Regions:
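Disordered, acidic Ser/Thr/Pro-rich linker "stalks" and the adjacent N-terminal cap
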Residues: 300-366, 374-381, 435-449
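C-terminal accessory domains and tails appended to enzymatic cores
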Residues: 6-15, 104-111, 123-142, 154-157, ...
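Trp- and acidic/polar-enriched beta-sheet ligand-binding modules for extracellular glycan
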Residues: 350-352, 364, 375-444
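Extracellular/luminal low-complexity segments enriched in Ser/Thr/Pro
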Residues: 497-507, 512
């Protein structure tokens, strides 16, 4: 029986997971977020965990958060919050661009290539404070004008400077600043990969608004629920969904366990709540019931595809989209429901060949090909043929809808110098391929170690409370990475696990359950506690105390 090392506020040290006991001392992590407080919405639990596992984390804010509040105030709040999560002040960078909203007046730096944008705070170039100059000034002793080219240049410089093993970023949220960061981060990663094919970071992205800041306010101190899938029209301020499109497939999301200090009985003791409290100017602590869940959600992308190193020729259309790392793009980041544009190779309708040829100067190995199609309800590729230079050929019948990926496992094909994609038939004219990822290996070895987590009705279980009348509970196991076979066992009492269900013995009041792989390197431990109806209600009284605490904090912050 393993005991937790994270026991400051964990009254049940048995409740633990191998995820919290890794050594990431040699792992370099780079987090990009738009605003001071997005570090919490984007990755609070993951940051806190890997910081305690000694990862080196560099935190980058692209804007100064200066829409209504002075940058100096936002900087100090960010430094304090990052410190709570375990990120030292010297590891924080400020790019210094202006904080904006969705305005539809083309004032955002996203639209400015030649002439600088003017921010809402009145600035036209990057700036910081005396203690924390903007990144451009730190590197070049001069500020950068507010243009999209400089924004991209700064992203590229930071990625090249840190050469992080893991890059984390906010994804395509509703906010214009979030959208620009998501698009330009993908663009920058694609460019860096072409410059240096040996650099192959993991890319993790997360929606900060629908999965945290604007998520369902469903926190409970008893069996706190998992992060819910956002729904347009139901989730707060959620007017457009990219989830379900491209690689954002809900069932393929990565779910991170939450550390003990983010699962406390009261908000006052919760490490994430303490980090939120540092952002006084934003009053974001009042949204804590939306932010806290039993898991933290991400989507992952590989960057080790050899297609980035290939020269591409196409029979017609723009072939540069096929290996730029961007599976989608928009030209208007302000619209509530943006239109995907400039992201696909679309051969001309009258083109008789409709082919794209990937050619390598040095032979490569091909084991898997992943294709992303265009998003269209009426236009699609019906048949497509893939041919490799060694004679391998495979015809596939149609790409999935919504730009979702199609995986073609070729088996190990060696000494490949060309890969040809040929569209054989299609419906309509607005079809295309947004990205072609060609891999030399079917699997990818992640820096984040494999882990497992016991699920009860799709919820990550830790200390799980049930009514004494419950006799059977469904038990499943979530796994990340190559864990091998996971076995569930009851470590005390007379309850038994059979066919994915826990059959509870009347004599058991606390049931200790362990999930573990054969090697013992991946494991999870939970406790199921049986309570009477009255005791369950009494247990939930802490929720009332938390609501009173939040109500008082709202009143206090309003008058500050």
């Amino acid at each position: 029986m393993k005991l937790s090392q994270d026991t400051e506020r964990n009254t049940n040290p048995y409740i633990d997971n191998s995820f919290f006991h890794q050594n990431y001392k040699n792992v370099n992590v780079l987090l990009f977020v738009p605003h001071q407080d997005d570090e919490i919405n984007a990755a609070a639990s993951l940051l806190f965990t890997i910081a305690r596992c000694e990862a080196r984390i560099t935190l980058v804010y692209t804007t100064n958060g200066d829409w209504e509040c002075p940058a100096a105030v936002r900087f100090n709040e960010a430094i304090n919050a990052a410190g709570v999560l375990g990120i030292p002040e010297e590891n924080i960078l400020f790019m210094g661009y202006g904080d904006t909203l969705n305005r539809n007046d083309k004032r955002h730096v996203f639209y400015h290539t030649d002439t600088p944008a003017r921010s809402a705070a009145g600035y036209t170039e990057t700036y910081g404070t005396d203690a924390h100059p903007d990144f451009a000034f730190l590197q070049e002793k001069q500020h950068h004008s507010y243009t999209n080219e400089n924004y991209l240049k700064d992203l590229l410089s930071i990625i090249r400077l840190t050469k992080a093993d893991i890059i984390i970023g906010t994804d395509f949220d509703c906010h214009a600043d979030h959208r620009m960061l998501s698009l330009y981060l993908d663009k920058a990663i694609g460019m860096v990969r072409k410059e240096d094919p040996s650099y192959q970071p993991e890319v993790w992205k997360r929606f900060a608004y629908p999965l945290a800041f604007n998520a369902v306010a469903d926190y409970s101190s008893v069996n706190n629920p998992e992060t819910k899938k956002p729904v347009v029209g139901d989730t707060h301020n959620y007017k457009f969904s990219i989830i379900g499109f491209f690689y954002f497939i809900w069932k393929e999301r990565i779910r991170i366990p939450v550390p003990a200090m983010a699962r406390t009985d009261t908000f006052r003791d919760n490490i994430i709540c303490q980090a939120l409290e540092q952002h006084v100017s934003q009053r974001i602590v009042t949204e804590v019931t939306r932010i806290l869940n039993s898991d933290e959600i991400f989507w992952f992308r590989r960057t080790d595809c050899v297609s980035h190193t290939a020269d591409i020729t196409v029979s017609s259309g723009n072939g540069t989209y096929l290996n730029d790392f961007m599976v989608y793009n928009v030209t208007n980041i302000d619209d509530d429901v943006p239109e995907y544009t400039d992201y696909c190779w679309r051969p001309e309708a009258e083109d008789p060949d409709k082919t794209a040829v990937f050619k390598w100067k040095k032979p490569v190995t091909v084991e898997k090909i992943v294709l992303y199609g265009a998003v269209s309800t009426d236009n699609k590729i019906d048949r497509l043929m893939v041919t490799l230079s060694n004679g391998f050929s495979q015809t596939v019948k149609g790409l999935p809808p919504n730009g979702n990926p199609l995986e073609i496992v070729t088996g190990k094909q060696e000494n490949i110098t060309t890969c040809i994609l040929k569209i054989l038939s299609a419906t309509g004219t607005d079809y295309g391929i947004s990205e072609c990822e060609i891999y030399s290996s079917k699997e990818f070895t992640n820096k984040i170690a494999p882990f497992c987590k016991i699920l009860i009705e799709d919820n990550f279980a830790y200390e799980y409370f049930v009514n004494k009348k419950v006799k059977v509970l469904p038990l499943t196991v979530y796994t990340y990475g190559n864990t091998g076979t996971i076995t569930l066992t009851v470590e005390n009492g007379n309850s038994v696990i059979r066919d994915g269900k826990l059959f509870i013995a009347d004599t058991d009041q606390k049931i200790f359950i362990r999930a573990q792989n054969k090697e013992g390197s991946v494991w999870d431990q939970i406790i199921i506690k049986r309570l009477s109806w009255f005791d369950l209600k009494r247990k939930k009284l802490s929720d009332i105390a938390d609501r009173i605490y939040l109500k008082n904090r709202k009143r206090q912050l309003k008058h500050n």
